[in-house]
């Protein structure tokens, strides 16, 4: 995932003018949505930062608690695959995700700390929301650093998501119709999301200090001291 070759390969498949059928992207994995995830973004008064995402995967995880600590165990390996078995999400087995020694469960979590060339933290961000996490963390970063939106707008801006399987671009109901039209011009199949798309938490350095936003999609509010 972090190799320059892999990044270049993905970049070569992206076009500003059109999307493509699933087969064009040569998919090798499928990640089911999860439901037991939370994200926390923190900046201390000395400028040190923490971006932490925690998950038990599905609601109530493995549904098994430790008899000693009472901690609920996760069921993270359900995001992986077993040969000859289709998982509960209807996903066929993928060799890339077979359970093997030394491997980690497949995850979408991407807690992020953006640092400037001066070494100072510029943005702390992350999200909860299954396969939507990566997309919407990236969107919050793009909205703030590229488009210049303040952190509140970057977090609250209507979002979209496409996880390739199925090859449908889901958009939030209040997204600008011009965005949907532009997607369809590029041959995207769009549909309105039945609920919100992911939940983002972000902190951004400003000229006067720090600004924080907690996604109202799930009733969140930022806190400071």
UniProtKB/Swiss-Prot annotation:
Gene3D superfamilies: 1.10.246.130, 3.60.20.40
Chain residues that bind L-glutamate: 55, 76, 107-108, 129-130
A GO biological-process term: leukotriene D4 biosynthetic process
PROSITE patterns: G_GLU_TRANSPEPTIDASE
GO molecular function: glutathione hydrolase activity
Catalytic residues (UniProt): 37 (nucleophile)
UniProt-listed InterPro entries: GGT_CS, GGT_lsub_C, GGT_peptidase, GGT_ssub, Ntn_hydrolases_N
GO terms under cellular component: extracellular exosome
Domain of life, per lineage: Eukaryota
Pfam families: G_glu_transpept (PF01019)
Note: Corresponds to the light chain of other gamma-glutamyltransferase family members.
Function: Likely to be catalytically inactive.
Family per record: Belongs to the gamma-glutamyltransferase family.
Record-given protein name: Glutathione hydrolase light chain 3
Organism: Homo sapiens (Human)
Biological classification of the source: Eukaryota, Metazoa, Chordata, Craniata, Vertebrata
């Amino acid at each position: 995932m972090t190799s320059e070759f892999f990044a270049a390969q993905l970049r070569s498949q992206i076009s500003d003018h059109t999307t493509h059928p699933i087969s064009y992207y040569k998919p090798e994995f499928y990640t089911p949505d999860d439901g037991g995830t939370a994200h926390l973004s923190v900046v201390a008064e000395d400028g040190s930062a923490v971006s932490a995402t925690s998950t038990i995967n599905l609601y109530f995880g493995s549904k098994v608690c430790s008899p000693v600590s009472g901690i609920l165990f996760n069921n993270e390996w359900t995001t992986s695959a077993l040969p000859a078995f289709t998982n509960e999400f209807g996903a066929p087995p993928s060799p890339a995700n077979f359970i093997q020694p030394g491997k980690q469960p497949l995850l979408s979590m991407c807690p992020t700390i953006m640092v400037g060339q001066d070494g100072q933290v510029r943005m702390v961000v992350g999200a909860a929301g299954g396969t939507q996490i990566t997309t919407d963390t990236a969107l919050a970063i793009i909205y703030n650093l590229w488009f210049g939106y303040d952190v509140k707008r970057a977090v609250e801006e209507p979002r979209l998501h496409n996880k390739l399987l199925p090859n449908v671009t889901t958009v939030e109901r209040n997204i600008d119709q011009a965005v949907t039209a532009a997607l369809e011009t590029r041959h995207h199949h769009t549909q309105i999301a039945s609920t919100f798309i992911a939940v983002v938490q972000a902190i951004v350095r400003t000229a006067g200090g720090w600004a924080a936003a907690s996604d109202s999609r799930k009733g969140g509010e930022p806190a400071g001291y």
